[in-house]
Amino acid sequence: MSRGHQTQEVRRVRTPRRGEIPGVVEQIMGHGKLKVRCADGHIRLGRIPGKMKKRIWIREGDVVLVKPWEFQSEEKADIVWRYTRTESNWLERKGYLKL
């Protein structure tokens, strides 16, 4: 393989499932917590689960997928997925992301 050619892996974009809402990270609070503006209009305190903490780095402005808690569903949620720039552009074009 020559130096100038890179192969790109084609993979499917994870779409929101039942009970999951896309959102944009507004602020990093520390200790694995984020302030997320969700597509349904609520601002939730998002928690990064332990299995994602060390593997995925989340910054302000990133598009994430959150799953609201059973109780306090309008205030708190768990972060389920972080989208890349190209994935978030695709979601916006297809109408999944309305922010």
UniProtKB/Swiss-Prot annotation:
Pfam family, one: eIF-1a
Keyword entries, A-Z: Initiation factor, Protein biosynthesis
Alphabetized GO MF terms: RNA binding; translation initiation factor activity
Entry-linked InterPro entries: NA-bd_OB-fold, RNA-binding_domain_S1_IF1, TIF_eIF-1A, TIF_eIF-1A_CS
Residue intervals of the S1-like domain: 11-84
Domain of life: Archaea
Function of the protein: Seems to be required for maximal rate of protein biosynthesis. Enhances ribosome dissociation into subunits and stabilizes the binding of the initiator Met-tRNA(I) to 40 S ribosomal subunits.
Family stated for the protein in its record: Belongs to the eIF-1A family.
Name of protein: Translation initiation factor 1A
